[in-house]
Amino acid sequence: MFSKLAIFATAAFAVLAAATPVRRQQCTTGQLQCCESTSTANDPATSELLGLIGVVISDVDALVGLTCSPISVIGVGSGSACTANPVCCDSSPIGGLVSIGCVPVNV
């Protein structure tokens, strides 16, 4: 009985693992970007910068990307990889100067 259960569990895990694709360059929270630096919105320097450019963020713990540029999924594999801070960000209200709602990613 135990051996049948072990075989069933092993087969089930194998099917689940095969059916769940994982793409390293997938960005589910926004646009994939490379930022020169990242900081939380409540960091004094970041907060001052956001105030100067008129960006209001309600979540003070939100990760903010500074001086960001888009990364294309095609470009990641062909040499334009991000050597600074690769992140997925919800929005970039001031072009690439500030990106809001960022999540770190591995590329």
UniProtKB/Swiss-Prot annotation:
UniProt keyword list: Cell wall, Disulfide bond, Secreted, Signal
Stretch forming the signal peptide: 1-24
UniProt note on tissues of expression: Only weekly expressed in hyphae cultured in liquid medium.
Cross-referenced InterPro entries: Hydrophobin (IPR001338), Hydrophobin_CS (IPR019778)
Taxonomy, superkingdom: Eukaryota
Pfam families linked to this entry: Hydrophobin (PF01185)
Subcellular compartments: Secreted; Secreted, Cell wall
Name under which the protein is recorded: Class I hydrophobin hgfI
Phylogenetic classification of the source organism: Eukaryota, Fungi, Dikarya, Basidiomycota, Agaricomycotina
Primary residence: secreted
Self-association state and partner proteins as the record states: Self-assembles to form functional amyloid fibrils called rodlets with a length range 100-150 nm. Self-assembly into fibrillar rodlets occurs spontaneously at hydrophobic:hydrophilic interfaces and the rodlets further associate laterally to form amphipathic monolayers.
Biotechnology: HgfI has been widely tested in the development of antibacterial materials and as a biological drug carrier.
Gene name of the record: hgfI
Functional note: Aerial growth, conidiation, and dispersal of filamentous fungi in the environment rely upon a capability of their secreting small amphipathic proteins called hydrophobins (HPBs) with low sequence identity. Class I can self-assemble into an outermost layer of rodlet bundles on aerial cell surfaces, conferring cellular hydrophobicity that supports fungal growth, development and dispersal; whereas Class II form highly ordered films at water-air interfaces through intermolecular interactions but contribute nothing to the rodlet structure.
Family: Belongs to the fungal hydrophobin family.
UniProt xrefs under PROSITE patterns: HYDROPHOBIN (PS00956)
Organism of provenance: Grifola frondosa (Maitake)
GO cellular component: extracellular region; fungal-type cell wall
Disulfide bonds: 27-88, 34-82, 35-68, 89-102
GO molecular function, one term: structural constituent of cell wall
